[in-house]
Amino acid sequence: MSSTSRDAVKSVNIYGHISALPESIAAAFGGTVSTIAGPECDVAIFAINPAAGIDGPTIELWKSFDEFQTPRLVVITVMDGMEMDFDDAVLLANRVFDPLVTPHLVLHGEAGTPIGTISLNDLTTTDYSTNPPTRSTADDELQEIVKDFREEFLDQMVEMEEGAFAAGILFPAIPVNTGNGLGIDLVKEFLAELPSRS
């Protein structure tokens, strides 16, 4: 991993329908909500609300970045009471964007509230309902539940070289809830992979 940091990234642009809360996503990552694609953007974050889907202008913006090979990632807002969920949004984005990878899945509490994530790389869980978030290794039952998802993810990653995200050829989808902080650290890890402009 390079020694660059999130602070070295000059321009983080956020795109997406207003229902996906792009303003709060921008605030979480020091970005700017935009409606224009261009080569001056260091990374493009596309915010998606599973309940609203993906509108035409957002799809066109995604495609506009192809010529610049801009690093792009998708953040999917996961909140209480949503009928559509992270998996639904990823399926839709896979059809209208480029194929995405899902390095983390959402974990729900007993009331159905999204409270955590599981890494498909190392099977580490993060519980964001605690302060600070609690990390642990998934139990055997959870590992069995995510087994097929993990195999698919690892197969996708075999084809990718280190730096694929920064090169603009790997497109991660990350669940995010700015209310409880779910996924914010995961997005920041990807942003830290980006080189500075210096």
Predicted ranges, named:
Residues M1-S198:
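Structural and coupling elements of P-loop NTPases
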